[in-house]
Amino acid sequence: MTKKQRYNKELLLEIAKKIKQLREKKNISQDVFYIETDIHIARIETGKLNIRITTLQDICDYFEISLSEFFKDM
């Protein structure tokens, strides 16, 4: 694995962790999240899916935060 690949994987895992924290803070299950957003979040939350920026924007909209707020502490 190259340095860039490691960095990309670490970034995906940080994004995944943040999404899961947001969801758990609102006490929302993955199933409820899917029903309300039509976004399958399980693979995103494990870092196994390279999330598109548009999907991340949809997730941020759902949690009523901006993309800049999402990345603020990362």
Label for each model-derived stretch:
Residues 39, 43-46, 54, 72:
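Base-recognition residues in the alpha-helical recognition helix of bacterial helix-turn-helix
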Residues 1-25:
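A short, Lys/Arg-rich alpha-helix, primarily the initiator
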Residues 19, 30, 53-56:
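Helix-turn-helix DNA-binding elements, focusing on the entry/boundary residues of the two helices
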